[in-house]
Amino acid sequence: MKTSIATVSINGTLKEKIHAIARAGFDGVEIFENDFLTNNLSPKEVKKLVKDHGLEITLFQPFRDFEGMPDQHRKRAFDRAKKKFEIMEELDTNLILICSNTSNISLGGIDRAANDFYELGEIAKERSIKVGYEALAWGKYINDHRDAWEIVRRANHENVGIILDSFHTLSKKIDLNSISSIPAEKIFIVQLADAPSHNMDLLYWSRHFRNMPGQGDLPISDFMNALDRTGYDGYLSLEIFNDSYRSGPREQIAKDGKKSLVS
C-alpha cells in the first residue's frame, strides 16, 4: 500500500514539512487546512511544491460541522463546502475529509445526514471530487464508524465514501468485524494512529497523546487484520496529534512514521 502522513503530524512551516515528508519516503501528504492557511504560498504554489517533491496530496482536511445542520444554517454549510472544493481544484487533490458534526445546533438523524451527503456528492461529482466521511469519537450524533458507514450506505453516491481512523475506532473498543463488511471501494482512505492507555476525555486524549503505530497500547494489528479482510489497497496515512512530535525534530519523526507503516 502507498503511505501518507498529515502535515499536522510534524512541526515546521508547510515547506519544511513537505521537504521532511518527501525525504522520509512517503508517497503522499494530507494537507491540514491550518498549515495551508498559515503559509504564504498560493494553492497553485503548494501544488507545485508537493509535485516537485515527488508527492501527491492525498486529501484536504478537515471540514467540520457539515451534516445535519438546521435549515437556516444548511445553505452556509454547502457554501463552505463549495469554497473548499475550489481550493482543492487549485491544489490538485480530489479527496476531502468531512468529520462528523460536533456543533450543538446540529440535528440528528441518519436519513437527514445521508440526504446531505447525497446532495454534496452531486456537487462534488461535477468537480471530480470525492467526499470522505469520518466518525469522530466525540461527534454529537455520529461517533462510531458503523453509523458513519450507514450514512454513506444510505447516501448511495459514488463520490461519497467513508474514512476510517484507527484511533476513533479503537479508543471506543468498537467491534472490528464491522470494518470487514465495508466494501473496499467505499473506503476512501485509512488513517492510522496508536496511543497509550489513558482514562481521559476522548478529545483531549486524541489531540495530545497519539503516537506512531506500534508505539502505544491500541490493538493496531487487529485493526489492520480487519482492514485486510475488506481487500482495501489504498493509502495508509498517519494522522498524529502529539505535543512532543510538534516540537521535536521533524525529519526524524517523519522517518519514524514511515518506518512504522512498513514494519
Task: Name each model feature, range by range.
Residues 1-4, 11-24, 51, 92, ...:
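Histidine-acidic metal/acid-base catalytic patches
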Residues 7-15, 31-43, 65-75, 103-108, ...:
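Acidic-and-aromatic substrate-binding clefts and catalytic sites of carbohydrate-active enzymes
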Residues 15, 52, 67-162:
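Active-site acidic/histidine proton-transfer and metal-coordination neighborhood
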Residues 24-33, 59-65, 100:
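Short, conserved active-site loops that position catalytic residues or coordinate cofactors/metal ions
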Residues 27-28, 56, 94, 130, ...:
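Residue-level detector of anion-binding/catalytic polar loops
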Residues 30, 59-61, 97, 132, ...:
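Conserved beta-strand positions in the central sheet of alpha/beta enzyme cores
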Residues 38-57, 129, 213:
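Short acidic, glycine/proline-enriched helix-loop-strand junctions
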Residues 42-53, 116-124, 178, 222-226:
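Catalytic-core regions built around general acid/base machinery
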